[in-house]
Structures are given as structure tokens and as C-alpha cells.
């Protein structure tokens, strides 16, 4: 799944006195060093991959057994005309699936921390090959289940008790049985690159237009611009962000104008790649009987398109707080006009807060207490390095970034590159939101219904961040610190709810062009994007000549209706954090039950049972009301 990290503090290097937080460790804290050899990092700070597999040598033996077992699955094919034969085949298939998942995760975790280790790279590739082989075998499994009539399936379940274990998988598969075509038609769609029926994440299978877009982006020749040190530098996607954040208006304006000017010169090519992507998605949707691309891609996770439209309609009805934010930015930065290049420079002087891992953990645990004793007991154990969930510090050849990854029957894993900043603390809270969601799902669901859908994935993580943000704001020691925390909260909501919803509306609009048979041109896309910018950002925001071309370099528009989940995820996380804090134990329990639900029910049912209905405005409104309130809080602090 493609995901975007949602930070509650993105720009800062933080430094509060250790004494601010309870539970400070008297021992000398470990000092992170990204150039340190992994061998020099104490083992207590490394995750325990041996909970997945006993050793590298055992991995080599186990992968060989799996390779043999994959070939032997074909021996079951001759008995798939009986319920007992189907049950034995499914048991063997999913047993192998479980073992491959563990071995693949073991290999991936090792490669993440030692990216230049050839053995780790080789094992990772072997794991991927085996996964691909099992996916190909899965076609036989799907065809077998889908080939049964309703009566045949009913009889099979009555006559073969061993099949009942697989009911969640069977029901999920057969829900879309009417979308499956004849064998000949299925073969043609597969040759065309069908990704509506993929066993893996839809967006893991890029079509040709997306590949062309990526090549175009990678080959862009960007001009020289003035850098942060006032010397000429080559503009790149890597330095564009820092330049756009510069406090020197000439520097940030120069970077934005250079980027958009270059992209504008290729606007027709970008319009072609995006238009062809939409046409291909529509072809696949219509081939399977869907009216729209939106309906097709949301159906995989049983999502009602009403969720998508509700997000857009609710945000559109609540853009005035964003207009207030633009006005506040104008006043604070003492600007005559607010342009795109003025949206990313900090409104408030960054506060410096340094926290070693132990103190960061204590801060998180203090902030998450509203989640209750059950959650906190498990979280405390999960964050204890001795229990092997986490790989904490950076080292030479360790891949940058952070993630949480899980497989059934084993505790989740969390990768960090912790360097004692509050940014890292926020990331840690986020990743443990994912990890705890997976833990609850794994320990409360059977194998076939533990893996929650991507639509739910960002809720637990952003709920944790929302609770951490509120705790920090409530316990700020100075007005300057509180102002900075408030400004970071505003920026998170602006960029994740408002901006991603604007993207979602743009994505809907250009797909509607294709669905209506209207040619997709750069002019049409530019006009749609400009109209949305005006509507969202309001009268105090001034568009420059090439601002309408921003759509052209956004990769999310090739991800087939995925970008909206960032906005719904953060909105839901904020709504849950607010409800849990204000309403107490009963709401907390319904929230934890949602985490425990895995994929046992549809995502919308799980959310409704927890108290959120994303087909209605309330959850989105809750997040935007927080934004509005925060604008007022910040204005009161910094506008004299």
C-alpha cells in the first residue's frame, strides 16, 4: 500500500529539558549516529527477527521446503471436484501462504537494516519470487471457488466441516462473483494488464501511463535557482521542499516558479499520461460492469461511493476556516498577498525539543492514557526494546524512514531511525498506532480475517498523533512553544484534509470527463485545478501564472482513488481522539473493538459500530472544527 506519513510536527528539531517529562532515565542515553556500523549498536535496540525464523540457515532450509510445497500444490488440482479435495487444497494453500509471509517479512526486515548485505538482498528476492508464484497458484483457487454454484457451495459447507474455516475468504471472493467474466475474456483482460482483480494492492500494479509519467518526472531538466545559502543550485525534487519552506520570500518564489515553469512547458505530455491512465482505468471498470472508475476501485474494500462524495461535500461546506487560516498567514508574515510559495514557510519560530528514546516513550504513554489500561499495558510492553518489536536507531546502510509491518501469529515490527527529535516522537506514536492495530487484529481474529483494509490503516496511527498533539499543547510551558505546536497542527490538517480532498475532487472531475467521453486536455485540467484552488483557499489567496499546473507532478492521481483515504484517515483519527477524550470509557471500548475487528466486517460497519459514519458529515466536521478552533487559538497568541 502506498502511504503518506502524517506528521503532527514536520519542520522542527525540538529540545525541551528532560526534566519536563516523568520517567526520565538516569542512565546515560544512547547517542544516535547514522554513520555508525550496525554491529556497534547494542542488540537491545534492535528488533528480534528470530521470532519469525530461528536463523539465516533455518531460513534457507525453510524457503527450500516452501519452494517444493508450492510445486506440490498442483497435485491437489485433480481432486478439486469434491468438497474434501477443495478443503485439503485450501488448507495446504493457506498454510504455505502463512509460512511464506513469515519468511518474506524476515528477509525484508533484514534488508531494511542492512541494505548493502548481498545475502539479505538475495533472500528478499527469493521471498518475492515465492510470493509471486503463490499468487499465480491463487488463480486456480479463485477459479475453483467462483466456479461453484450457490447450491454447490451450500452443500460443500454442509458436507465438509473443514471448509468452514475458510468462510471469510470464500464470502469475500464470491461477493464480486458477478464481475468475473468467461475464461477467454479473463485471459484478454489479464493480457491487457487487468488490476481490478489483483490479489495484492491495486496500486502495486502500475499501468503503462503511470510508468510513462514516472519516466517523465525522472528525466525533467530543472533549472538553476538560488539556494538556501544564496548560492546557485540545481533545482531538484529533493531540494524543492526545503527551498519552498525558506523564510526568504525571493528564494521560495524562485523555486516554485522554476518548478512550475518547467512542468508547464510539458503540460500536454502530462495531460496525455493522466488522460490515458483514466481511460485505461475506465476500460477495466466497464469491462467488469461498473459504471464508473470510482465505483470499481472502492468496491474492492466494500466502500460505498457515498463516503467519497461525503468527504468532498463536507470539506467544501467548511472551507471558511481555511480562508481564516490564509488571512492569519497573511497577517503573521506581514504580506500584501498570499501566494502558493507563502503557504509552507513557518508562521511561528520553530521550538527546539530534544528527547531520547526513553523520554519519548514516556511522553507518548502519558499522552495515550485516554486509551485505557488494557491498551497502555500492551503498548508499554510493545515499546520496551527488550521485547523485540522495534529497531530504534539509524546506522550505516539502514534504509531511511519508518514503518510498521506485521504477519499473522507474530508480534508486529516497527522500524525507526530515531534521532532524539520530537518529529521522531510523533513518528513513533504514529507507527505504534499501526502496530497496536495489527496486534489487536492478529490476537482477536482468525487467519482469514485479520488483515484490515488500507482504508482503515491510517486511523489508529493518526488517533495516536492527535492525542499526542493535544497533550503537548495542553502541557506547553511557554506561549512560544504552544504557538509552534498549534501551527504544526494547523499545517497537518491543511495539507492532509483540505489539500488531499482538493486532490480527491480533482481526481473525480477528470475521471468524469473521461466517463462522459470528453477529451482530457491540459487546458481542461488547468481550468479545473484553478477553479478548485480558488474555491478552497478563498479571496486572500492569489494564483500566479503557472499555479494551475501543480496537478501535473502529483503521483497520487495515478493511484486510482487512493488519495482520499489520507483525508478520511486523519479526520477519523482526530474524531476518535476527540470522542475518547471527551466521552470516556464507553467510546474507548468501541474504538478498541474496531481495532480488534480486523477484516471481520466491512470497514464502514466497523466504523459505524465504533461511532463514526463516514457517509455522513460529522466526523469530517469534527476535524475541521478543530482546525477552526486552532486558527483562533493561534491568532490570539501571536496577533497583537
Name each model-derived stretch.
Residues 23-350, 361, 637-639:
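A well-structured
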Residues 227-247, 353-429, 433-438:
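Active-site-adjacent "gating/activation" loops or surface patches in catalytic cores
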Residues 328, 332-380, 390-391, 437, ...:
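Long, K/E/R/D-enriched contiguous segments that form extended
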Residues 39-41, 50-54, 145, 175, ...:
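C-terminal, non-catalytic "cap/extension" segments appended to globular domains
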Residues 9-19:
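Bacterial N-terminal signal peptides
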Amino acid at each position: 500500500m502506498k502511504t503518506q506519513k502524517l506528521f503532527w510536527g514536520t519542520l522542527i528539531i525540538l529540545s525541551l529539558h528532560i526534566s519536563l517529562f516523568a520517567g526520565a532515565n538516569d542512565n546515560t542515553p544512547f547517542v544516535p549516529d547514522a554513520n555508525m556500523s550496525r554491529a556497534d549498536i547494542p542488540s537491545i535496540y534492535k528488533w528480534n527477527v528470530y521470532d519469525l525464523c530461528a536463523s539465516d540457515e533455518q531460513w534457507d532450509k525453510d524457503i527450500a521446503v516452501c519452494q517444493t510445497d508450492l510445486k506440490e500444490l498442483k497435485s491437489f488440482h485433480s481432486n478439486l471436484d469434491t468438497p474434501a479435495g477443495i478443503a485439503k487444497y485450501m488448507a495446504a494453500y493457506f498454510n504455505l501462504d502463512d509460512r511464506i509471509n513469515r519468511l518474506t517479512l524476515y528477509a525484508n526486515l533484514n534488508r531494511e537494516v542492512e541494505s548493502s548485505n548481498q545475502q539479505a538482498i538475495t533472500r528478499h528476492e527469493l521471498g518475492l519470487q515465492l510470493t509471486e508464484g503463490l499468487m499465480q497458484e491463487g488463480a486456480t483457487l479463485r477459479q475453483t471457488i467462483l466456479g461453484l454454484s450457490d447450491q454447490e457451495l451450500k452443500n460443500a459447507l454442509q458436507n465438509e466441516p473443514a471448509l468452514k474455516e475458510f468462510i471469510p475468504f470464500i464470502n469475500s471472493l464470491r461477493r464480486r462473483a458477478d464481475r468475473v467474466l468467461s475464461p477467454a475474456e479473463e485471459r484478454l483482460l489479464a493480457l491487457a494488464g487487468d488490476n481490478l482483480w489483483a490479489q495484492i494492492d491495486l496500486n502495486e500494479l502500475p499501468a503503462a501511463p503511470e510508468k510513462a509519467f514516472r519516466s517523465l518526472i525522472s528525466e525533467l531538466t530543472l533549472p538553476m535557482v538560488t539556494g538556501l545559502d544564496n548560492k546557485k543550485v540545481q533545482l531538484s525534487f529533493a531540494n524543492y521542499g526545503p527551498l519552498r519552506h525558506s523564510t526568504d520570500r525571493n528564494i521560495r518564489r524562485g523555486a516554485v516558479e522554476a518548478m512550475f515553469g518547467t512542468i508547464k512547458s510539458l503540460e500536454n505530455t502530462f495531460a496525455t499520461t493522466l488522460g490515458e491512465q483514466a481511460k485505461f482505468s475506465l476500460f477495466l471498470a466497464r469491462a467488469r460492469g461498473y459504471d464508473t472508475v470510482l465505483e470499481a476501485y472502492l468496491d474492492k474494500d466494500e466502500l460505498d461511493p457515498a463516503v467519497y462524495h461525503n468527504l468532498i461535500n463536507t470539506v467544501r461546506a467548511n472551507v471558511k476556516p481555511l480562508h481564516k487560516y490564509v488571512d492569519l498567514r497573511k497577517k503573521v508574515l506581514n504580506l500584501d498577498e498570499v501566494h502558493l510559495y507563502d503557504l509552507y514557510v513557518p508562521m511561528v519560530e520553530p521550538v527546539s525539543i530534544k528527547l531520547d528514546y526513553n523520554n519519548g516513550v514516556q511522553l507518548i504513554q502519558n499522552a495515550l492514557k485516554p486509551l485505557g489500561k488494557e491498551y497502555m499495558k500492551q503498548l508499554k510492553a510493545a515499546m520496551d526494546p527488550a521485547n523485540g518489536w522495534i529497531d530504534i536507531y539509524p546506522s550505516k546502510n539502514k534504509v531511511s524512514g519508518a514503518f510498521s509491518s506485521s504477519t499473522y501469529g507474530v508480534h508486529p515490527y516497527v522500524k525507526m531511525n530515531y534521532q532524539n527529535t520530537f518529529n521522531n516522537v510523533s513518528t513513533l506514536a504514529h507507527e505504534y498506532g499501526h502496530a497496536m492495530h495489527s496486534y489487536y487484529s492478529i490476537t482477536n481474529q482468525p487467519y482469514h480475517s485479520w488483515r484490515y483494509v488500507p482504508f482503515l490503516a491510517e486511523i489508529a496511527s493518526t488517533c495516536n498523533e492527535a492525542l499526542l498533539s493535544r497533550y503537548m499543547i495542553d502541557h506547553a510551558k511557554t506561549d512560544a512553544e504552544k504557538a509552534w505546536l498549534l501551527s504544526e497542527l494547523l499545517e497537518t490538517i491543511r495539507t492532509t484534509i483540505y489539500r488531499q480532498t482538493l486532490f480527491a475532487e480533482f481526481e473525480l472531475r477528470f475521471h468524469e470527463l473521461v466517463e462522459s467521453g470528453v477529451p482530457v486536455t491540459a487546458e481542461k485540467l488547468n481550468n479545473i485545478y484553478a477553479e478548485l484552488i480558488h474555491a478552497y483557499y478563498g479571496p486572500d489567496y492569489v494564483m500566479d501564472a503557472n499555479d494551475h499546473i501543480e496537478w501535473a507532478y502529483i503521483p497520487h492521481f495515478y493511484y486510482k482513488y487512493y488519495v482520499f483515504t489520507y483525508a478520511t484517515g486523519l479526520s477519523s483519527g482526530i474524531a476518535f481522539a476527540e470522542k475518547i477524550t471527551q466521552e470516556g470509557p464507553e467510546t474507548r471500548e468501541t474504538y478498541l473493538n474496531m481495532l480488534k475487528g480486523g477484516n471481520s466486517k466491512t470497514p464502514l460497519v466497523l466504523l459505524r459500530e465504533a461511532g463514526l459514519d463516514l457517509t455522513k458529515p460529522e466526523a469530517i466536521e469534527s476535524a475541521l472544527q478543530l482546525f477552526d478552533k486552532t486558527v483562533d487559538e493561534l491568532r490570539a497568541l501571536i496577533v497583537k
